[in-house]
């Protein structure tokens, strides 16, 4: 069972969520780039690990640097070290329909975010219904949803693999290239199902940054909001 949150939640936002579920492993990148700015994540990861005693190891994935300095994080290991040596053969074991899959959280507008456990079978059936019947996603599609891994739409996007669709992922600001970055991706990546949060598209439209004439609708089907 796993859970995720976005780097923009900050240290306390992550602790408010992860502190309730007693995680044993914390995975983090050493940092990220947003709108041209390099943002370090190691100090935040160190604070999170110190605040949650259940965490046994912090696994760091290099992104800003090929060799991140891990000295300030106790229990830290590099992702590459987890892959070294003789690894056992990957085994897929049958699970029960109601076994837990991941934990999402409420918005936190009325206090600390509440944990919401999602089961394997129910989640897959619900997502498959929405992908197949509501969105008509198939193995011929290239599926994109602009979302962080802290929003439930990330989980919804990943389930598109069950429909055989190819997933297109984007890491960065939606307002790069004067607001055209995501729209340009439709042509560049041949995206057939494009979706984004209402606020990100509306902000660009209101600023008159996106012209409908810029979009090749022969490639992409109507967007999902």
Describe the function of each predicted region.
Residues 12-13, 18, 24-27, 95-99, ...:
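Hydrophobic, small-residue-rich alpha-helical packing segments that form membrane-like cores
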Residues 1-81, 198-200, 218-222:
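Structural core segment of the AMP-binding/adenylate-forming
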Residues 5, 29, 61, 103, ...:
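Generic beta-strand/beta-sheet core signal
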Residues 59-60, 66, 71-105, 112, ...:
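Conserved pre-ATP/AMP-binding loop-to-beta segment of ANL
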Residues 15, 92, 180-183, 212:
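Short hydrophobic/charged patches on amphipathic alpha-helices used for structural packing
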Residues 1, 124-142, 152-192, 207-209:
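Conserved AMP-binding/adenylation subdomain of ANL enzymes
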Residues 77, 165, 192-193, 206-225:
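Gly/Ser/Thr-rich phosphate-binding loop
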